[in-house]
Amino acid sequence: MLLAPGKGFVFLASTKSGSTSIETAFMSHSQMILRKPPAIKHTTYAGFQRFLQPFLNSKGFPRESYEVVCVFREPIDWLSSWWRYRSREKLANPTDPKHRNYTGEVTFEQFARAYMEGSEQFAQVGRPSRFVRPRSGQVEVDRIFRYDRLDLLVDFLCEKVGEEVEVGSANTSPDRSFFLSRECETELREFFAPEYRIYERAIGG
């Protein structure tokens, strides 16, 4: 998460959406950077409204003085990125503290079904729709950009900071192909209905 109210923006770091690359590129323009642990880096919008928005207000940055922005990935693509990320070789080691999250021996369809059922630790990765949900009675995220149009987010942030900034890649998931049966894909799209409503409205569509 980047807090740059002096430049007119706050960037929420949604998971599996290029947030590390954006943070690395624009961190020098931010007043505060929340990167570790992941639970803090990926603070939800509601969490921001509860804890950080009042802090910024107390420092002379009322909510209307900056825009809150984030990235939203196509839901099934987002889920497959988690599946691929948790198949990395490091997690295959039984002595690794996060070995229980290893998905190297799980098909994507098995992962998707476990995700919908909430039955396995390795498939507990949250929901994108909950990440952007505001607190009751409060304003929504100002701008949500599609992951496949990160160029639009970069252009927006460059305009805010007043200079061209080059964005690289970081924290990428391993390459791994997958197959979904038509039945499972249909169920997954129905499960992700709230996410698809947000994705369809996101900037870049």
What are these regions (language model features)?
Residues M1-G205:
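Membrane-interface amphipathic segments in extracytoplasmic regions
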